[in-house]
Amino acid sequence: MTKKLHIKTWGCQMNEYDSSKMADLLDSTHGYQLTDNPEEADVLLLNTCSIREKAQEKVFHQLGRWHMLKEARPELIIGVGGCVASQEGAHIRERANYVDIIFGPQTLHRLPEMINHVNGTRSPVVDISFPEIEKFDRLPEPRAEGPTAFVSIMEGCNKYCSFCVVPYTRGEEVSRPCDDILFEIAQLADQGVREVNLLGQNVNAYRGASYDGGICTFAELLRLVAAIDGIDRIRYITSHPIEFTDDIIDVYRDTPELVSFVHLPVQSGSDRILTMMKRAHTALEYKSIIRRLRKARPDIQISSDFIIGFPGETQQDFEQTMQLIADVNFDMSFSFIYSARPGTPAADMVDNVSEEEKKQRLHILQERITQQAMQYSRRMKGKVQRILVEGTSRKNVMELSGRTENNRVVNFEGAPSMIGKFVDVEIVDVYPNSLRGVLLRTEDQMTLRSHESTASVIARTRKENELGVGMYQP
């Protein structure tokens, strides 16, 4: 009888990536098949996020529901992973002693051994250590699930912003070796992936070892990924302003595979608040980066993160944030009301901004960003956009849906054979959350570079070093 696995995921794209790797890993080692129904699962995994307010209580609320399943089936295995597990591992066991496995973001690769231990001894396992980059060496080969894919290039963060728990839950920055990343992306390209999203808490801090003993920078990695046959679009999240260096900006000048859209969190437009947040840059320095980016790629569009109501934020501080939003003309944003994260320096600050004031400021900010986004969308009407067709439309199963470079959803009429390929459409209608297009040309009518498999490229360019070791040298 097939064993079933249910994974519930909260939080960032990195958590989504980790959950997909858990599923692939347990399928390869134990034959577990994913199910959306927790009642039929043999293993329940909760991949948690500690960014939002009351994250811990949300975890215990979910575990309470699963506890009833455990009482009915004592052999059911319940595991809690992610950032809340990393931060609150011991506390989770104290409050929910029926949880069998507690693991952190850096130890998910040990899940097979943990499950074997629980099955063999019926005793719990807690492993929330930070074993560097070991987990990537233990994960199964990547499996494409459509024309886009996410690839983790690094873990952790060294910035220690005063409001953020990431350094405490995911550890400090550790970069994957360059060749490992390129090989994973090449494998995905061979499976039909056309767009790759590079993931990390601070991707532009990437410093990965290369095969020759050197260090590969993020700018160099972007160019190497762009050279992989079959990869026609590159995105990345998330980056930090203080490491958005000129060599990264230069990639936007000469690498068309890198999309004209960048997410660059700023959090506030007030230098006083930025200092309290320990962001290590000013609003003017942030605007300087954007100015250089737009000089390198005039059509680039910018999204950002904003924290509203940080302790001590005055009306003047908020107005400076609104001025920055107008000056940069952000296209999109992820904006949230500040909530203290236990263990962070900001949690000890006096939170003297009323909830009503926070909500009002958030509403004003989001309204402004929405207006600016609609202005960008309206400018696209009548223009030709190249989109990567991802599948059928959510609005109408008889239509197709894809995304533009600037991350807008476009619905249009087309044939199923277009899924996974690029098409050019004319934008004819603009809606708040999507665009409507009319098909103009398909991929075989474009002048895209021809695709050659990775195996073929390696065979054609293979060389041996002085030790007789085969190497791929582009």
From Swiss-Prot:
Its cofactor is [4Fe-4S] cluster. One of its GO terms (cellular component) is cytosol. [4Fe-4S] cluster 1 binds at residues 12, 49, 83. It is an enzyme of class 2 (transferase). It catalyses: N(6)-dimethylallyladenosine(37) in tRNA + (sulfur carrier)-SH + AH2 + 2 S-adenosyl-L-methionine = 2-methylsulfanyl-N(6)-dimethylallyladenosine(37) in tRNA + (sulfur carrier)-H + 5'-deoxyadenosine + L-methionine + A + S-adenosyl-L-homocysteine + 2 H(+). Its main location: cytoplasm. Gene3D superfamilies: Methylthiotransferase, N-terminal domain, tm_1862 like domain. [4Fe-4S] cluster 2 binds at residues 157, 161, 164. Keywords: 4Fe-4S, Cytoplasm, Iron, Iron-sulfur, Metal-binding, S-adenosyl-L-methionine, Transferase, tRNA processing. Residues 143-375 form the Radical SAM core domain. Residues 378-441 form the TRAM domain. Binds 2 [4Fe-4S] clusters. One cluster is coordinated with 3 cysteines and an exchangeable S-adenosyl-L-methionine. The keyword Magnesium does not apply. NCBIfam families: miaB-methiolase, MiaB/RimO family radical SAM methylthiotransferase. Belongs to the methylthiotransferase family. MiaB subfamily. PANTHER family: CDK5 REGULATORY SUBUNIT-ASSOCIATED PROTEIN 1 (PTHR43020), MITOCHONDRIAL TRNA METHYLTHIOTRANSFERASE CDK5RAP1 (PTHR43020:SF2). Catalyzes the methylthiolation of N6-(dimethylallyl)adenosine (i(6)A), leading to the formation of 2-methylthio-N6-(dimethylallyl)adenosine (ms(2)i(6)A) at position 37 in tRNAs that read codons beginning with uridine. HAMAP family: tRNA_metthiotr_MiaB (MF_01864). Monomer. This is tRNA-2-methylthio-N(6)-dimethylallyladenosine synthase. It comes from Sodalis glossinidius (strain morsitans).
